[in-house]
Every structure is written in structure tokens, then in C-alpha cells.
Amino acid sequence: MQKKIMLLGSGELGKEFVIAVKRLGHFVIAVDSYNDAPAQQVADRREVINMLDGAALDAIVARHQPDVIVPEIEAIRTERFYDYEKEGIQVVPSARAANFTMNRKAIRDLASKELGLRTATYRYAASKEELKRAIGEVGVPCVVKPLMSSSGKGQSTVKTEADIEHAWSYSQSGRRGDSVEVIVEAFVPFHTEITLLTVTQKNGPTLFCPPIGHRQERGDYQESWQPCRIGDAQLHEAQEIAEKVTRSLTGAGIWGVEFFLADDGLYFSELSPRPHDTGMVTLAGTQNFTEFELHARAVLGLPIPKIELLRVGASAVVSADREGKNPDYSGLEEALGEPCTDIRIFGKPATRPYRRMGVTLAYDEPGSDVDTVKAKAIANARKVRVTSE
């Protein structure tokens, strides 16, 4: 039976999800705060509202009467989801999961205090004065993040007391939602960051994708690769942690569970209840299902017989370097001239410095050197130039 799916947030991850569910025959309303967002370009209907406005959110839900609501971003009045669930609407993964994971304080306290997971030492601060005290307790270097933000917005590293003023002002400029509060995390001396894509199903066991390695700058991913080399014991531990936290949050869908790998072991970092930006590497055909296809199947209650690695792959971000509109792209011929490569241009209508506008993809046979594949993706990303008016 055809489902009516409302997507809240219509960026590049949402675009690929829409394509996946449209291929399965479903109807999609794509919602965002601006018109012509990437997912709106491939959806059946579109709405443009401020999703932090509860009345506006209620109005479009009442107008369209969706069967399923799929959040893609943090800046949503997520407490409304509990009411929608009571009305019989499926919220993905669940209203509880969406509310907990849209706020770093809720998910960190759940992970550390309730579930006893190992995390970086952390404190919270709701003012510049509290931030100074929190940093004094945590020590430097440390990372300051808004409780609600994505793609590294508002995130900075404090190395000395002189950085505190900037850290506070930057966190406030990059936050989403109403809360001014930030989380202060002690720096973990990790050697690898991984994402463990975890799939919870309505009528099946929890499944795991092969681990994805990634590198970040300014809190935003720059490259990702799959598989990431990790010991069997650490992988098993990561899977146990991912299953524990997703079971607590409840619901069906894909989750991006992030970990730090350090010399002294594994640290839980963050969790997203939706396809993960680092998981765009699966668009390179690394698995038998992309993360978006897995999300679609899990959300719709369709079977996922198994997840298997098909080949080695990598993704690298194509970013803008200035503010503008009507972006154009050059260098595609050169980038696509390399064998075993591909590219995705997201279709965002405007640019700004560091804004992610596309990704290059590279792949090779199973067992190939992942560093070589990653280098190819990075080299191709540098060939693509973004211009705008």
C-alpha cells in the first residue's frame, strides 16, 4: 500500500532518501525552511515553513495527513512528535528517539548516566561565565558545541583561555533552536573516528554496516571511507554499544553511531537517528544497499535479508568558498574521466563558505587499498570548482 511520507528537512541526505522511497512507490512531501531545497526537487509536494514554529508544523501535518514523518534535521519542534504518534502517525525512528537525539544534552546524559557508556569528560554551560567554569573543570584542549546544531556549525576547539570569547560567540551564531546552552567536551586523543551505521527493524534483528572511517574539519566531515580498519574486539564492542543505545531510544530506521578509537579504547561520541553524512560513501556501491535504501526499507517495514560489503569506497566533499546564488560547477569532465569514480551534485540553490555542495566518489575491488581509493576521491574533489553569482 502506498504511504504518504512527510520529510522534515530537505537537504542532500533527504534527497537520496526521497529517491529511495520513490523507487518503492511512495508519495513524499518535502519540507524545509527555504524553497527548492535538494529533496524538494525530487519529491511529489513541497512545503516551506519554519519547523521550529509548532503551529506551522501542526498546520502542514493536518493539511497533508501523512502516514509517516521522517525528520532529517535538528531544528524542528520535536516535542510535537509525541502528539503525532498518539494520532497514529509513524515518527521515524520514534518520537522518543527524535527528541533525545536532536539535543546533545539528552543523548549524552542517556549514554553516560543511564546506559553507562564511556564518553569524553563533559560539562554544560548556558552563559559565557559558566563556559569559563566548565572549561576550567574539563581542561584544555576541549571542544565546545551548541546543544543543537549540525555539520559542525557553532563548534570550535578551545586551546587557551584566549579562545573562550570566540568559542561562546561562535556557538551562539551556529546554534539551532531556542537553547543557548553548549556542551564542553574534553579532547579525546583519538587516532580514528568511525561511524557504525546501525539498522533497527520493525520485525527483524538489529543489523550493522561495515564500519566507516571519516575525517572532520570545523566539526564537519571532509572524507569518509569504507571499510575502516578496526580490530574484531573493538568492532564487537561498538556493535554492542550501538545496539544498546538504539534499543533504548526505540524505533525503526538507520542510525549513524559515532565513536572515537583511541589508544586506551573506544569512546561513544554521538548518534544521529537518520542517514549520516559520512554514509554517503555507500553511494559508491560499497554495500548491497546504500544507507538511504536501508533507511527506506527499515522505515517501511520491508525485509533486509543481509548487509554485505561489495567493494572498497571513499567519498570526499566538494565545498563552496564564498557566498552567492545560482551555483555552477566546472571540472566535472576532468573528475569523471578517472575510472571507478562518480560524483553527486546536491542542487543547493545558494553557496556560502564551507557549504557542502556535492561529493566525489571512488571505489575499487574488495581487498583494494582503501588509502589509494580515498586519495582518488580527494583528488577528484579538488578538480571540481564551485562558482556563484
From Swiss-Prot:
Binding site residues for ATP: R104, K145, S150, S151, G152, K153, G154, Q155, E185, A186, F187, V188, E193
HAMAP family reported in the protein's UniProt record: PurT
NCBIfam families with a match to the protein in the record: PRK09288.1, purT
Binding site for N(1)-(5-phospho-beta-D-ribosyl)glycinamide: E12, L13, E72, D277, K348, R355, R356
Top-level lineage group: Bacteria
Keywords of the record: ATP-binding, Ligase, Magnesium, Metal-binding, Nucleotide-binding, Purine biosynthesis
Record has ATP-binding as a keyword: yes
Positions contributing to Mg(2+) binding: E258, E270
Domain ATP-grasp residues, every copy: 109-300
Organism: Chlorobium phaeobacteroides (strain DSM 266 / SMG 266 / 2430)
Pathway: Purine metabolism; IMP biosynthesis via de novo pathway; N(2)-formyl-N(1)-(5-phospho-D-ribosyl)glycinamide from N(1)-(5-phospho-D-ribosyl)glycinamide (formate route): step 1/1
Designated name of the protein: Formate-dependent phosphoribosylglycinamide formyltransferase
Gene: purT
EC code(s) of this entry: 6.3.1.21
Family under the similarity heading: Belongs to the PurK/PurT family.
Subunit text: Homodimer.
Pfam family, one: PurT_C
Purpose of the protein: Involved in the de novo purine biosynthesis. Catalyzes the transfer of formate to 5-phospho-ribosyl-glycinamide (GAR), producing 5-phospho-ribosyl-N-formylglycinamide (FGAR). Formate is provided by PurU via hydrolysis of 10-formyl-tetrahydrofolate.
Gene Ontology CC: one annotated term: cytosol
